[in-house]
Amino acid sequence: MGSMSEHIPATNSTGTTRVKRGLADMLKGGVIMDVVTPEQAKIAEDAGACAVMALERVPADIRAQGGVARMSDPDLIEGIIEAVSIPVMAKARIGHFVEAQVLESLRVDFIDESEVLSPADYANHIDKWAFGVPFVCGATNLGEALRRITEGAAMIRSKGEAGTGDVSEAVRHLRTIRAEMARLSSMSPDELYVAAKELQAPYDLVAEVARTGELPVVLFVAGGVATPADAALVMQMGAQGVFVGSGIFKSGNPAARAAAIVKATTAYDDPDTIAEVSRGLGEAMVGINVADVPAPHRLAERGW
């Protein structure tokens, strides 16, 4: 495991880094689906989802309706936990450590400190070491990813642009993170000090990424994945799994699309399988071109 956090003793209330990252590792190669009801959670589980994300409104609805988006009602989260046997994640606002405390008390399996909700703190993210439950956080570049890992994140996902059905931002973020990791791998030790300063991340963590060529945690992709081909695209580009939000339950045939995206994520390098599972899925979500989203409404720009 990485050198970060080795100094933090494990207590009854704090899961060790090894355990938290190991839990995230078990989701590798899978699809995590946004669900708003226990019925949707069952559809996701039956389709082969490796986990579900419990929330009141999918990102497309949050985007359309506006207003302040907060943590979901505990009754909704508990209903989804009771409905399925796979891990259940839930979202807390950036910096809102009390929402995270509530989610931990509800016994969710992962907390997503998410830019999809309205940020609670525009300067600080949650201190994730203080929790026993593992956190997943979004990143648009390597510096952001390393800062979240420094704060205790056990899984990183690209932010993409949630609720659009446009995969281009997720692709850009994944390419950026992977290109920046490759760049570190070719640097000499003295150059890594400057790189750490530029990335605003600890030198030890930067040196570890330079040595391994990978993040010390699992890297998933989120934001705009709407079709089996989208899922296979990001997997071929080096993602270790996929989050699908609005793309499934905003489409014409959610059960079929969910199963197809799971199959395409597993067989991501087999075009014949992807072609087969892409047939007859009905209407995809309508979607919004990211270029048409004005800067103040871009969710990926939340987080620092």
From Swiss-Prot:
One Pfam family of this chain: SOR_SNZ
Catalytic-site annotation from UniProt: 91
One GO term of the biological process aspect: pyridoxine biosynthetic process
Keyword list, A-Z: Lyase, Pyridoxal phosphate, Schiff base
GO molecular function: pyridoxal 5'-phosphate synthase (glutamine hydrolysing) activity
Binding site for D-glyceraldehyde 3-phosphate: 175
Entry EC no(s): 4.3.3.6
Lineage: superkingdom: Bacteria
Gene3D superfamilies named in the record: Aldolase class I
PROSITE patterns: PDXS_SNZ_1, PDXS_SNZ_2
InterPro entries for the chain: Aldolase_TIM (IPR013785), PdxS/SNZ (IPR001852), PdxS/SNZ_N (IPR033755), RibuloseP-bd_barrel (IPR011060)
Pathway: Cofactor biosynthesis; pyridoxal 5'-phosphate biosynthesis
Catalytic activity annotation: aldehydo-D-ribose 5-phosphate + D-glyceraldehyde 3-phosphate + L-glutamine = pyridoxal 5'-phosphate + L-glutamate + phosphate + 3 H2O + H(+)
Residues engaged in binding D-ribose 5-phosphate: 34, 163, 224, 245-246
Root EC class: lyase
Family: Belongs to the PdxS/SNZ family.
Protein function: Catalyzes the formation of pyridoxal 5'-phosphate from ribose 5-phosphate (RBP), glyceraldehyde 3-phosphate (G3P) and ammonia. The ammonia is provided by the PdxT subunit. Can also use ribulose 5-phosphate and dihydroxyacetone phosphate as substrates, resulting from enzyme-catalyzed isomerization of RBP and G3P, respectively.
Quaternary organization: In the presence of PdxT, forms a dodecamer of heterodimers.
Name of the featured protein: Pyridoxal 5'-phosphate synthase subunit PdxS
Species the sequence originates in: Cutibacterium acnes (strain DSM 16379 / KPA171202)
Encoding gene (name): pdxS
